[in-house]
Amino acid sequence: MAEKRHTRDSEAQRLPDSFKDSPSKGLGPCGWILVAFSFLFTVITFPISIWMCIKIIKEYERAIIFRLGRILQGGAKGPGLFFILPCTDSFIKVDMRTISFDIPPQEILTKDSVTISVDGVVYYRVQNATLAVANITNADSATRLLAQTTLRNVLGTKNLSQILSDREEIAHNMQSTLDDATDAWGIKVERVEIKDVKLPVQLQRAMAAEAEASREARAKVIAAEGEMNASRALKEASMVITESPAALQLRYLQTLTTIAAEKNSTIVFPLPIDMLQGIIGAKHSHLG
């Protein structure tokens, strides 16, 4: 109850002065007479007239009551049960649920002179039912048109690269701009999303060619770096082998093993001369 009372007080504070006045200050003598007759008619025809006076609105709705064309003091009524006087009172229902709509594709010229087609989606709801009825003829239609112009105005100040990379930030800026513009209508813009950015076919081909060239350039750089690293490793290995003859012989044996494994063959090679000389010398010394 406290929350509902706070909402009605805030609505009353935001209304123009003509809406804040009590109906008794603007009805005039004739209006008072009509209200009195309506009340007497209700009393005389009771309980039949009670069915004309009782109205019920759903949880997600609010009712704006007009008495002889003037909005009653207190703001929107509901949800639940409320009463009106027959003949003098009328009311309008306002749906308070969140509404979404698509922004049609808009042809936009970016800051760097590129023509693109952009569409989006907007989520909004009625925050103040009284303002939505009293200050605007059709809040939904006005919000849709304003969303289209806001999309063109915001994206027209951005480069193509910014539009493609900063979509969330641009959508947030649009949401803030729309929310401020529709505040006087009692509308709360909750979210804006940019759905699709369509580029011209020629620009798409140019961007694809640029991306392919960039990939090829990176591949060539990687291959060149690999060759450079391999040459450095070979240079270091050759220096080590040159300094150690035993390492050269070991490498020779490893190469023969690899060749034999690949060809599935047996390779016969003579023993090194220095090894034979060592064996013969050891035998002679043993016999002597």
Curated annotation (Swiss-Prot):
GO terms for biological process: positive regulation by host of viral genome replication; positive regulation of protein targeting to membrane; positive regulation of viral process; regulation of monoatomic ion transmembrane transport. One of its GO terms (molecular function) is ion channel inhibitor activity. It is found in: Cell membrane; Cytoplasm, Cytoskeleton; Membrane raft; Melanosome. It holds the Pfam family Band_7. The modification Phosphoserine is found at S10, S18, S161, S244. Residues 1-22 are annotated as: Disordered. PROSITE patterns: BAND_7 (PS01270). One of its GO terms (cellular component) is perinuclear region of cytoplasm. Changing I273A: Complete loss of oligomerization. Reduced lipid raft association. Detected in erythrocytes (at protein level). Widely expressed. Residues 1-25, 55-288 are cytoplasmic. Residues 26-54 dip into the membrane without crossing it. Changing Y252A: Complete loss of oligomerization. A lipid is attached at C30, C87 (S-palmitoyl cysteine). Changing M275A: Reduced oligomerization and lipid raft association. Changing V268A: Complete loss of oligomerization and lipid raft association. InterPro entries: Band-7_stomatin-like (IPR043202), Band_7 (IPR001107), Band_7/SPFH_dom_sf (IPR036013), Band_7/stomatin-like_CS (IPR018080), Stomatin_HflK_fam (IPR001972). Homodimer and higher order homooligomer. The homodimer is banana-shaped. Interacts with ASIC1, ASIC2 and ASIC3. Interacts with LANCL1. Interacts with SLC2A1. Interacts with SLC4A1; this interaction positively regulates SLC4A1 activity. Identified in large complexes with SLC40A1, SLC14A1, SLC29A1 and AQP1. Interacts with STOML1; may redistribute STOM from the plasma membrane to late endosomes. Regulates ion channel activity and transmembrane ion transport. Regulates ASIC2 and ASIC3 channel activity. This is Stomatin.
